[in-house]
C-alpha cells in the first residue's frame, strides 16, 4: 500500500445502558452497520476496495470479543484479506479514529 486514504467516518447511535433500546443489539452488529454506512457514504468505494478498517470502541470486551473491528468488518462484507484494528481510547475512541 502506497497511500492511506480515509474515505468516510460514521458514529453509531447512543443509548442508555444497560436497559436502553439498543441493549439487545450485539456490539459487533452495531459496528457493522456503521461500517456499511461509511462505505455507502463513499461514492465508488465497495467493500472489496477496503484494505484496512480502524474502529474506535470504548469497551472492546464482552460478547463481541477483544477485536470488535475485525468481527464487525467481516459482518459488514469487508473481505477476509483486509486488516482491522480496534482503537480503545475510552470515551474518545471515535475521535481518535478520525
What label would you give each PLM region?
Residues 1-27:
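Condensing-enzyme catalytic core mediating Claisen C-C bond formation in acyl metabolism
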Residues 11, 16, 52, 58-61, ...:
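Short glycine- and Lys/Arg-enriched binding-loop motifs that mark or flank ligand-binding interfaces
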Residues 12-15, 39-44, 74-78:
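Generic secondary-structure signature for well-ordered alpha-helical cores
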Residues 27-43, 68-72, 97:
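Short, well-ordered amphipathic alpha-helical segments that serve as non-catalytic structural scaffolds
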Residues 30, 53-54:
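Loop-to-helix transition at the N-terminal end of transmembrane alpha-helices
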Residues 46-52, 81-83:
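Short acidic capping loops at alpha-helix termini that bridge into adjacent secondary structure
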Residues 57-98:
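Conserved catalytic cysteine-centered active-site region
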Amino acid at each position: 500500500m502506497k497511500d492511506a486514504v480515509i474515505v468516510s467516518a460514521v458514529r453509531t447511535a447512543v443509548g442508555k445502558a444497560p436497559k436502553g433500546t439498543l441493549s439487545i443489539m450485539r456490539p459487533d452488529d452495531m459496528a457493522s452497520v456503521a461500517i456499511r454506512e461509511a462505505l455507502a457514504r463513499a461514492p465508488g468505494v465497495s467493500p472489496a476496495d477496503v484494505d484496512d478498517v480502524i474502529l474506535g470502541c470504548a469497551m472492546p470486551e464482552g460478547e463481541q470479543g477483544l477485536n470488535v473491528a475485525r468481527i464487525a468488518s467481516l459482518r459488514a462484507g469487508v473481505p477476509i484479506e483486509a486488516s482491522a484494528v480496534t482503537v480503545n481510547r475510552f470515551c474518545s475512541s471515535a475521535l481518535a479514529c478520525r
